[in-house]
């Protein structure tokens, strides 16, 4: 029993004069006293910016929705100018607030793709005659063919990116409704 008494003394008194660390105080919970922050609705400026993105998409896509087109040099130039309008319009719109930054990033990427398409259409127009023709089998014919393919592909890619931006904007709009 003497051994048991020594063990109890050690357990209660600590070892070799060291004191046990005091037990930590229970953590206070402030959840009940502080209300959860609510999301503020989008501002009128943010909503206007979202509307401007939708309008931009329609403006850029409009010339490409024709049921048929004759690819004259003027038409190639018109298509290039329509694609180039994305970057100009985005600069005019300016950057939105922080909540719409993911949308802004997507629109910026779309405008970059569309600008590449504009350069492709300009290249195609530069090797074409007034009615859009080139001499078959020439370097100009190959450049025109590649450039037109490039322009239409870039338009499709840019339009898809703008659609993605509109979807992201709709999700953000719903989140802050």
Describe every region a protein language model picked out:
Residues 1-4:
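Bacterial N-terminal signal peptides that target proteins for export
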Residues 11-14:
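C-terminal motif of bacterial Sec signal peptides marking the signal peptidase cleavage site
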Residues 16-39:
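Short, low-complexity, disordered segments immediately C-terminal to signal peptides
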Residues 39-123, 127-177:
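Alpha-helical segments in soluble extracytoplasmic regions
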């Amino acid at each position: 029993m003497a051994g048991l008494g020594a063990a109890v003394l050690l357990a209660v008194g600590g070892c070799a004069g060291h004191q046990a660390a005091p037990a930590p105080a229970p953590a206070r919970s402030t959840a009940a006293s502080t209300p959860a922050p609510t999301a503020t609705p989008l501002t009128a400026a943010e909503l206007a910016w979202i509307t401007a993105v939708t309008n931009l998409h329609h403006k850029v896509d409009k010339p490409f929705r024709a049921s048929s087109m004759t690819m004259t040099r003027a038409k190639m130039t018109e298509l290039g100018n329509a694609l180039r309008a994305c970057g100009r319009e985005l600069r005019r719109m300016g950057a939105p607030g922080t909540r719409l930054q993911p949308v802004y990033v997507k629109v910026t990427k779309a405008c970059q793709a569309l600008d590449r398409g504009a350069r492709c259409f300009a290249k195609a127009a530069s090797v074409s005659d007034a009615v859009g023709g080139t001499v078959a089998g020439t370097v100009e014919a190959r450049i025109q063919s590649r450039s037109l393919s490039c322009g239409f592909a870039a338009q499709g890619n840019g339009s898809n990116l703008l659609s993605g931006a509109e979807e992201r904007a709709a999700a953000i709009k719903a989140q802050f409704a």
